[in-house]
A protein has these predicted regions:
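Membrane-interface segments of envelope glycosyltransferases acting on lipid-linked substrates or membrane lipids
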Residues: 1-193
Length: 193
């Protein structure tokens, strides 16, 4: 049985977590063994939801707190090394949220060759895309975005992935997330008094 490692900075209640939970359910339904590794913050409720979906869950931070700077890199290195030794995943799927690049670089350094990254936002939150482009070109098998607009904001072009899409030279794609499409964004003036 193929083991898939899902890497995510936090397991709270948000769109990325719900999308990742849907991903876990799909992998489990196809017969894969899924291990979800949460680096930092988590809610017990969300951990239980992932477990009920069929994933084993490893929370690296016993207190659910974030570790920053060099200590954070060392913390992630030790935690990911322990998870890789214990579960020996065939594929790592990293949710590209802060710290997005560091876990990918550490996984590569620790010998993981099959890495997929998914970014859940558009590129305007990044002051510079050089690191994202380096990761996309040299460190991951595929870099997926949740909308074509997001993919274009990162890479200048987009392509909706389907089962016939070849995974060769071009390794960034759009795979729409499974969140309801019916959200409307309303711009309104609000007074905070």
């Amino acid at each position: 049985t193929m083991t898939i490692l899902i890497c995510i900075p936090c397991l709270m209640t948000g769109g990325t977590e719900i999308q990742t939970l849907n991903l876990v359910q799909a992998f489990v339904a196809e017969g894969y063994r899924v291990v979800t590794t949460c680096y930092f913050e988590y809610s017990d409720d969300m951990v239980v939801r992932f477990q009920k979906a069929g994933s084993e869950v490893v929370c690296l931070s016993p207190t659910g707190t974030r570790v920053n700077g060099w200590r954070g890199i060392l913390f992630l290195y030790k935690g990911l090394r322990r998870v890789l030794k214990q579960y020996k995943p065939d594929v790592a799927h990293v949710q590209y949220m802060a710290p997005g690049a560091i876990p990918i670089l550490l996984l590569r350094w620790l010998g993981t060759r099959q890495i997929i990254a998914t970014v859940h936002t558009v590129a305007d939150i990044y002051p510079n895309l050089r690191l994202v482009h380096f990761i996309q070109r040299h460190c991951v098998r595929a870099f997926t975005c949740i909308t074509e607009l997001a993919e274009r904001s990162f890479f200048g072009t987009s392509r909706l992935y389907n089962e016939n899409t070849p995974l060769n030279k071009r390794n960034h794609f759009t795979i729409y997330n499974a969140l309801p499409p019916g959200f409307s964004i309303v711009s309104e003036n609000r007074s905070f008094s």
